[in-house]
Amino acid sequence: AVGATTTLSNLIVQFLMGMCNGFAIISAQCFGAKDMDRLRRSLGNSLVLGLLAAVVLTIGGLVFLQPILRFLNVPENLLNTATQYVSVIIAGLVVTLLYDVLSATLRAIGDTVTPLIVLAVSVVLNIGGDLLLIVVLHMGVLGAAVATVLSQLIAVVVCAVYLWKKYEILRIRVDDMKLQDAGMLRNMLSSGLSMGFMSSLVNIGTLTLQTSINKLGQNIIIAHTAARKISEIFMIMFSVFGQTMATYCGQNLGAGKIERIRRGILLATGYTCIWCTLNIVTAYTIGDWLVWLVTGSKTPEVIYNATLYLKVDTLFYYVTAVICIVLSLIHISEPTRLRRIS
């Protein structure tokens, strides 16, 4: 059930995450320029705009969930459990949004360690929650979804308390949440939507394939799900570098340090290309073992198709890497039309 619908839930979650990282670019520019009033206002506006987007996606997702799942050709025997899983994930989008805004804001002011630690703790709690709710309480797929949302909720509380106590400059007031600055709103929406669509680009493509994949039987669904999970792990580095460079470039643009931006882009491109090469080597040497590790299946059809997916997919990672780095430059550019086109 999770495998047949994971692309849909990932699409929504990745869009929100990308959008929040786009908002944080404006915060990074304000921080680089040492304009703390605008920094607080950018955080307040990020929360308001993000919450509006999360509420719209939650309502729309819950209302149209059944038609979407049928459009994706989710097998009838998986439809009920798939509905339970995606419904909980969608219902928790506000929690997801709050974590994304807070962690992106911390990165925007140069604190990259805290979001990483909180994320690691959240992952451990998620795994522990899965074991408790699925293995002990026998809640099945519903338990997996609940564990995900609860672990994110804990991450939100930790981030909020840390941010409030550690950074007085980020203690927003009611006035900071008023959408009054037209220029800031325009830049935030342009950057946020651009980053949102970029972050969900792969999932948009995969979603179009899911309708056909779900018709090909259980083994192909398992193979595709396993390959996508491994591929997502491989591609985390591109997303991390893209988000980091967008924040880094925003800070240095605000501070007027253009040469540091050039140097950072070259280094990031080099590092991601090295990562691409390592992924290709991994796919062609131990790809089948990774598939077995993820699925626990020794079915030849599952192993062969998932490994083939990885071997073909990783060859094109260089293109993805360059796109993520270049877009980080475009997202800090002044012409908003260029951001939208990108």
Task: Name each region found by the language model.
Residues 25, 66-67, 104, 131, ...:
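Transmembrane alpha-helix boundary and packing residues in multipass membrane permease domains
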Residues 1, 69-76, 132-139, 200-229, ...:
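Helix-terminus/linker motif at the lipid-water interface of multi-pass membrane proteins
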Residues 331-341:
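Single conserved hydrophobic/aromatic residue that forms the stacking wall/gate
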Residues 61, 130, 159-163, 210, ...:
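Structural signal for membrane-spanning alpha-helices in multi-pass inner-membrane proteins
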Residues 27-92, 136-193, 249-316:
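Short alpha-helical transmembrane segments in multi-pass integral membrane proteins
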Residues 88, 122, 151-155, 159, ...:
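Transmembrane helical elements of multi-pass membrane transporters/channels
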Residues 112-116, 144-145, 221, 337:
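Alpha-helical transmembrane segments and their helix-entry boundary regions
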Residues 2-59, 96-115, 223-287, 320-333:
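Small-residue-rich hydrophobic transmembrane alpha-helices
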